[in-house]
Amino acid sequence: MIPARRRAAIAICSGIAVAAAAGAARAQSVEQFYKGRQVTMVVGAAPGGINDITARFVARHLGAYIPGHPTIVVQNQPGAGGIAAANRLYNVFERDGSVIAKLERAVPMLAIQGDPNVSFDPRRLTWLGSLSSYAKDAYLMLVMAANPIKSADELRQPGKSITLGGDNAASSNLIFATIAKDVLGLNINVVRGYAGAAPMFLAMQRGELDGQIIGYSSVRTGQRDLWSHHAFRPLLQFGRATRLADFPDIPTGHELTKDPTASALLDFAELQFLISLPFAAPPGIPADRAQALQTAFMAMCADPAVLDDAEKLGIEMSPIDGETILGSIARAAATPHAVIVRYNALAGPQRD
């Protein structure tokens, strides 16, 4: 048995060693930390969609702007509409700058809504920025071009309706379809349970669905051939205060209501689009590494070569920094409680 005095001495020495190691880690420069390192880019979605495409786009480019030029490797970790990845980013992953994530745009708002599946505070995450603030994008209600419905106004007429698809209960496409029906008063039937946009597009082509609600950049990226051949007709655009220049004749959701309560609900629902393609790291990473990641992200977004690559992929680039994301989250948190309660009621039951 080790004598008590010796055990105490060992404990003191161990504490000194741990403190020294921690001090050495703090003394390590950002470049030294990242040089030769593999950084993990977590994506809270399955391969193939816009979240995966943009994550791999950033993974290809971001390392060149981080001191030490680390390699960035993408890991898809889908689950609970992106909540699972955000929870792990906040509670599980190392807080040393070696893990970053492409989060679903609605995930920060779910925390404000009080979603019981959320176990993170979006105000404490280390936000790198967002590729898009939706300045050049819109969330479109689309039908096939051959559909007899030509405008959103027709959907207020007796006997005229469309059937839209959606995936899980709290997905943006399903929520905005419900808002169009229950808040804007459009004659819409909603069928849920589709596993993403691609199966819904197939259902539209087979005549099982009339349409869906999806981002302009997403449909141009995922359905490039059909879009270029004018296979779809937009009826309505969300996520914008004014009409996108590409759709000067298509009304916004706000144009279809004069009710202040409905407008406030739309404002809250559309806040997610201001941080449309967000990237974050865990809270509490060393300040110099956080700053390096944030600076690198915005430098990447300003590089003409990167912008050219984004254009080829159909990624809408209107970047904002991490501070702007925090401002949008604060604005959402200031929403009157009654509006959030109404929004949650429209969003329906929690995810399956």
Model-predicted segments: where are they?
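Sec/Tat signal peptide C-region and signal peptidase I cleavage site
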Residues: 21-27
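Conserved hydrophobic/amphipathic secondary-structure segments
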Residues: 28-276, 343, 347-351
